[in-house]
């Protein structure tokens, strides 16, 4: 989700999207185990 939000911001420059990115980033820092699970899904996609 972070990558998607960052990509949208980098393409549009939309400030609201950047603020959403920062909010999601902060939530992930509070719960790092969920971020690790999300990253693992990207490494090994389910077919």
Curated annotation (Swiss-Prot):
The protein's name in its UniProt record: Uncharacterized protein YqzL
Organism: Bacillus subtilis (strain 168)
């Amino acid at each position: 989700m972070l990558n998607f939000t960052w990509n949208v911001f980098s393409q549009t420059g939309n400030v609201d999207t950047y603020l959403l990115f920062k909010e999601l980033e902060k939530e992930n820092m509070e719960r790092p185990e969920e971020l690790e699970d999300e990253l693992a899904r990207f490494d090994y996609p389910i077919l």
